[in-house]
Every structure is written in structure tokens, then in C-alpha cells.
């Protein structure tokens, strides 16, 4: 069939050739690509066209005529509706292979780099891994419920469990939902701006078993607040109950004010033997088991002997910095969020690590100032947001010429782009190691080390 003859709502047969970065299958009609969610490479499907653009279109899978050997039955009852996971229909081995392939292809396409990409480091059990949940509260069929948003929507799915959340946090969300309903608490309505409770958030410390519950409310006063807290304390094993007040009409979850309603205002966890105090706001990796794997890759890549000066750009609460400080002469960390820097300093003190310096500011401004002041890195670590490293920071790295750059990435595309700039500037990379931090989703983390040639 010619692509020019395709029409909206038309049913067509085609073979899926590949997966996109967001996990949709890709099939082609006369060279014209159609993106079809919930399909896998090698499958012959019948699909209904739902949208046609000039260069590509979208279709909805109707039937599978030939099933991939990698297809599995998703165990989650609401997988087809929920926007949280996108790869439950693909076997876990298939997911790991998909992520490795994504990294390898991205390195070639964007970075023009011929590097070794080993098999993705996955989990023995890829379920129940998340130590943090942020669950919106709303009315479904006239009842208060807490669940996740439907795909491309703010309609809440009524769900009893989430298979990628840890059991303790999952149970706490369900109990909290019951207790709020018992007292007639009114969920926040996005359209009217009325209601009392917006989100239930949990944080669980994997190594200590401590659990924090956060109630995000529209105002400080909430009907039956004391009774709700009392019931929560009696029915759940909690370390902390915190209230966040967010009175604004916004999609941002947290407001500016925090109030501890019961217990401590932090929970404590450990990574590689380093203790971390975690508040409701702290940035902290959500998969504790794989964080150990990811950071071990960074530690091994740094090859520290105790004589090195290390700079950690985008240091957050100091999680990588403090793991490296055990083996370095001195570690300097920079982060734009001041609260994170305060947390990093507190965590250094908690671990009695005196060979650290943390400063608030933009990495691309602070690190050049350090360089001018005579602070030069033997090893420079970057763990940037999805947009990758700032151009000015990359220029500073090329001027400073640290012996090694350890790059921890959450976006293969910007990793490949930045590696191209660094390799053009005299650095050499031999491999990029993918790490699966988020099973059942398309998100990929990767670690590489670039050596000055």
C-alpha cells in the first residue's frame, strides 16, 4: 500500500520493526513510519490509524497476528490505563536488551562514537524497587481515592497497589486513603481550586526501614487533622508525618511551607556505608539497590588512591561526593539548590568527613571561579539533569583538563552530545555502561569515564 493512500480510522496490517525511545513499536507502510504503543519488534499486527502527520503517524494496536517471544502478560491490573509504566508487556531480559541498544544506537547516531556498550546492569527482582511515591488524591465515582494519572491525562485511576513501589510505602498510601475517607476529607479539585488534600507522599529508607508520610494540603488547617494523625500513628509503622502546605493553583506538587506533625522531620538511609539524612524535599535516588550499583560504577571509574582532588558538579545532597570522599584527598561539590547544599554539609558532618567543601551556585560559574583560585581537579564528576552539561561547564572542563571525567547520565542523548564535545577536545572514552534504575519504564542511566589523551 502507498503511504499517500492512508486515512485516519483506517485499519492496516504491518510488521513492527523497532522500538522508539519511549517504548512504542514502529512499523512502516511504503517507508512511512507509524508509531504503535504496546507492540514489539517482529510482531505482525492489525492497527487502526488515529493520527497522520506529514512524515509520520500514530496508530492503535487492535490485534496481534504473530506474537513476539519477548511478550509477557503485564501483572498490573491497570497497566493499559496508567501512565507510570510503559514496558511491562516486554520481558525483563528484553527490557535490558532494549536499553543497551538505545544507548549503543544513541552513541553512534548523536555522538558519532564507537564505544563498547556492555549488557545493561539489571535487577534480580525488578519489582517493588521505588522508595518514594507521590500519589494524587481525588474523587472517583463519588469516593475519595488515591492513584496515578491515566496516560496523557489528569484523571486519577482508582488502584489498590503499585507493583514498582515498595510494599511499606504502598500499604501506607492505602491506609492513609482509608483514614482520610473515614473523616470525610475533601480531595483537591484542580478545576475549582477547592478541597483539603492534594497528594500523599511516602519515603522509605531501605537500610533502616524508616518511613516518612507527607500530606500535601491546600491550607494548614484541615478538618480532623489531629484525629487523622492519631489514626495514622496507630495503624502504620511510621518515623515521621510531615504536612506540606500548597495553596496555589498549580501542577507543582509541593508548596513552600513544611510542618512536622509527628515524629522526626527526616529519615536516615545509607549508601555504600555513608549515612544520609533525608527530608521530604531532599533529592535522593528512588531505587536504593541500583543506586549502589550505579555509584559503584562511578567509584570504580574514578580509581582513587587517596591523593586526588575531586570536583562533583551537580552534587545534590552529596550522595556521590561523600562516597568518593572516603577515598579522595578532598572533594568539592557544587549544586544550584541551596537546600541540597545544606543537606550535603549536614551529611558530611553526620559521617565525620572533613575533607569536603560544598558551595551553592551554578556549576558553570562556581567551577571556573575555583579554577581561577587554584583549585584544580584530578577527577571531575558530573551527574547532570536530563538536559546534560551546560556548554560553559564543558568549556571549563576542557580548559582545566582533569585527568578523568566521570559522567553519570540519565539521558543517553545528552550524554552522547557532551561526550562528542569532550572527545573532540582531547578526551577518550572506551565504554558506556547502562544501568537499569527504573525497570518497567524506558528511562536509562549510564556511566562512562573519559580519560585525557
Give the predicted meaning of each segment.
Residues 1-74, 78, 358, 365:
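Terminal RNA-binding accessory module
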Residues 2-13, 21, 220, 224-235, ...:
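Rossmann-like S-adenosyl-L-methionine
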Residues 25-30, 147-150, 214-216, 344:
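Short, acidic/hydrophobic/Gly-rich beta-strand patch recurrent on exposed beta strands
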Residues 62-74, 83-187, 222:
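Extended interfacial segments that mediate partner engagement and assembly in macromolecular machines
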Residues 127-131, 209, 442-443:
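A short, glycine/Asx- and small/polar-enriched loop/turn
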Residues 200:
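Flexible loop/N-cap segments at domain edges
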Residues 209-211, 307-308:
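Nucleotide donor/acceptor-binding cores
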Amino acid at each position: 500500500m502507498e503511504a499517500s493512500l492512508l486515512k485516519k480510522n483506517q485499519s492496516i496490517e504491518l510488521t513492527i520493526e523497532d522500538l522508539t525511545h519511549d517504548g512504542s513499536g514502529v512499523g512502516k507502510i511504503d517507508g512511512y513510519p507509524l508509531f504503535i504503543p504496546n507492540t514489539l519488534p517482529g510482531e505482525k499486527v492489525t492497527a487502526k490509524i488515529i493520527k497522520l502527520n506529514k512524515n509520520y503517524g500514530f496508530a492503535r494496536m487492535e490485534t496481534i497476528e504473530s506474537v513476539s517471544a519477548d511478550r509477557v502478560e503485564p501483572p498490573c491490573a491497570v497497566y493499559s490505563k496508567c501512565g507510570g509504566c510503559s514496558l511491562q508487556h516486554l520481558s525483563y531480559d528484553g527490557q535490558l536488551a532494549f536499553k543497551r541498544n538505545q544507548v549503543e544506537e544513541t552513541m553512534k547516531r548523536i555522538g558519532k562514537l564507537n564505544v563498547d556498550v556492555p549488557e545493561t546492569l539489571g535487577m534480580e527482582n525488578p519489582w517493588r524497587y521505588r522508595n518514594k511515591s507521590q500519589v494524587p488524591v481525588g474523587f472517583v465515582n463519588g469516593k475519595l481515592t488515591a492513584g496515578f494519572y491515566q496516560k496523557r491525562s489528569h484523571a486519577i485511576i482508582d488502584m489498590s497497589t503499585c507493583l514498582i513501589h515498595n510494599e511499606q510505602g504502598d500499604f501506607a498510601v492505602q491506609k492513609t486513603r482509608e483514614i482520610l475517607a473515614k473523616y470525610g476529607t475533601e480531595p483537591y479539585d484542580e478545576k475549582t481550586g477547592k478541597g483539603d488534600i492534594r497528594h500523599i507522599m511516602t519515603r522509605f529508607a531501605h537500610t533502616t526501614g524508616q518511613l516518612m508520610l507527607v500530606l500535601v494540603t491546600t491550607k494548614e488547617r484541615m478538618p480532623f487533622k489531629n484525629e487523622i494523625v492519631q489514626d495514622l500513628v496507630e495503624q502504620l509503622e511510621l518515623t515521621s508525618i510531615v504536612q506540606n502546605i500548597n495553596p496555589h493553583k498549580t501542577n507543582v506538587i509541593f508548596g513552600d511551607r513544611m510542618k512536622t506533625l509527628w515524629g522526626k522531620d527526616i529519615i536516615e538511609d545509607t549508601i555504600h556505608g555513608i549515612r544520609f539524612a533525608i527530608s521530604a524535599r531532599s533529592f535522593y535516588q528512588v531505587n536504593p539497590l541500583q543506586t549502589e550499583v550505579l555509584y559503584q560504577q562511578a567509584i570504580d571509574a574514578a580509581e582513587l588512591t587517596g591523593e586526588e582532588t575531586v570536583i562533583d558538579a551537580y552534587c545534590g545532597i552529596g550522595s556521590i561526593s561523600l562516597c568518593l570522599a572516603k577515598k579522595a584527598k578532598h572533594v568539592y561539590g557544587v549544586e544550584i539548590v541551596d537546600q541540597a547544599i545544606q543537606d550535603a554539609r549536614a551529611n558530611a558532618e553526620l559521617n565525620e568527613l572533613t575533607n569536603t567543601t560544598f558551595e551553592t551556585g551554578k556549576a558553570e560559574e562556581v567551577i571556573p571561579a575555583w579554577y581561577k583560585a587554584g583549585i584544580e581537579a584530578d577527577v571531575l564528576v558530573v551527574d547532570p539533569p536530563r538536559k546534560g552539561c551546560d556548554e560553559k561547564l564543558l568549556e571549563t572542563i576542557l580548559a582545566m583538563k582533569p585527568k578523568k571525567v566521570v559522567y553519570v547520565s540519565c539521558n543517553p542523548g545528552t550524554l552522547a552530545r557532551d561526550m562528542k564535545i569532550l572527545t573532540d577536545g582531547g578526551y577518550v572514552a572506551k565504554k558506556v555502561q547502562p544501568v537499569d534504575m527504573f525497570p518497567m519504564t524506558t528511562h536509562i542511566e549510564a556511566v562512562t569515564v573519559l580519560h585525557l589523551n
